[in-house]
C-alpha cells in the first residue's frame, strides 16, 4: 500500500453538540422514569421516551464509529466511508486524479457537488478529485495532501513505464 489514511469526525464542536443532544434523553428518562415527574409541557409516553433515547444514542454511535478510510496502491484506489459506502477503482478506470482545494461543499460527510460529483469528507477542504473514463467524478477528502501528492507522482511514473 503506497498510501493509507483513516479519518474520523474529531471536531470538538461536533462532539459538544452531540453531548448536549445526548444529555436530553438522559435527563428525560431520569426525570420521568426515575423521579416520576413528567418531562416537558407535552411529555412523551415512557415508551416514546425510551425509543427516542435509543434513536439519539444510535445516532451518536454512528458518528463515533464513522470513518473515512483511503488506501491506494499501484493497482487501485480503495475508499470506505464506514458504515455507508465502499468503493474500489482500478487505475485503468481513471482518466485523471489530482489533489484539489475543494472549499466548502455544504458540510461534511457525503455531499453532492456539481464540480466534483460525490464528495466523501470528514473535515478540511483538500481532497483527491477523481475523474473516471465513464465520465463520473468523485472526491475523497484528505488530511495528508502532501503525502498524497508524492504518492500520485510515484504511481504515475510506475504506470507510464
Where do the protein language model's features map onto the residues?
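Conserved beta-hairpin
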Residues: 53-98
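N-terminal membrane-targeting/pre-transmembrane regions
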Residues: 1-43, 120, 125-127, 137, ...
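Short, solvent-exposed secondary-structure boundary motifs
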Residues: 51-63, 110-112, 117-120
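Non-transmembrane, membrane-adjacent beta-strand/coil modules in membrane-associated proteins
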Residues: 9, 79-142
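Cytosol-/stroma-facing membrane-proximal "stalk/adaptor" domains immediately downstream
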Residues: 142-161
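Hydrophobic alpha-helical transmembrane segments
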Residues: 40-52
Amino acid at each position: 500500500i503506497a498510501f493509507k489514511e483513516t479519518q474520523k469526525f474529531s471536531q470538538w464542536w461536533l462532539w459538544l453538540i452531540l453531548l448536549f443532544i445526548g444529555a436530553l434523553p438522559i435527563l428525560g428518562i431520569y426525570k420521568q422514569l426515575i423521579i416520576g415527574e413528567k418531562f416537558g409541557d407535552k411529555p412523551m409516553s415512557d415508551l416514546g421516551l425510551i425509543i427516542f433515547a435509543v434513536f439519539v444514542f444510535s445516532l451518536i454511535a454512528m458518528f463515533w464509529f464513522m470513518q473515512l478510510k483511503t488506501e491506494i496502491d499501484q493497482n487501485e484506489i480503495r475508499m470506505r466511508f464506514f458504515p455507508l459506502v465502499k468503493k474500489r477503482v482500478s487505475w485503468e478506470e481513471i482518466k485523471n486524479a489530482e489533489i484539489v482545494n475543494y472549499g466548502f461543499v455544504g458540510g461534511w460527510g457525503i455531499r453532492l457537488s456539481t464540480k466534483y460529483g460525490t464528495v466523501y469528507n470528514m473535515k478540511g477542504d483538500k481532497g483527491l478529485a477523481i475523474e473516471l473514463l465513464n465520465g463520473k467524478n468523485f472526491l475523497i477528502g484528505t488530511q495528508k495532501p502532501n503525502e498524497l501528492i508524492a504518492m500520485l507522482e510515484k504511481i504515475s511514473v510506475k504506470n507510464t513505464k
